């Protein structure tokens, strides 16, 4: 997932860590996870599915429509990553996530409007853990 977001232009360690922390909180990076923790296919879930637990009808069905249109499975990591970065919720914050030099708390503020979580949980702690583990390389 890190490589994918870097390829999308997100280079800042704290921005990447915030994205990873949110995905870990939502799904533990398990693409075929349904709300509540069961592992199942997209069509067997209904709502609250995947990497960021797409819950609202438009976002959940948007994942399925995207997969059908582009020939992927809505239950796989590559399809979900591609869908995630095409959603309007992501597009609204994408430029801010690409802007370097912000704190995790600031990036987390942006991420809320992207994911709209009901429970904050450990996402900020996870983000700090990732920030401590990520290595940035100047090229």
Locations of regions flagged by a protein language model:
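Export/targeting segments at the very N-terminus of extracytoplasmic proteins
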Residues: 1-28
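Peptidoglycan-targeting cell-wall enzymes and recognition modules
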Residues: 27-101
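Active-site or metal-binding loop neighborhoods of secreted/extracellular toxin and effector enzymes
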Residues: 98-139
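Stable alpha-helical elements in mature extracytoplasmic
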Residues: 1, 15-19, 77-80, 84, ...
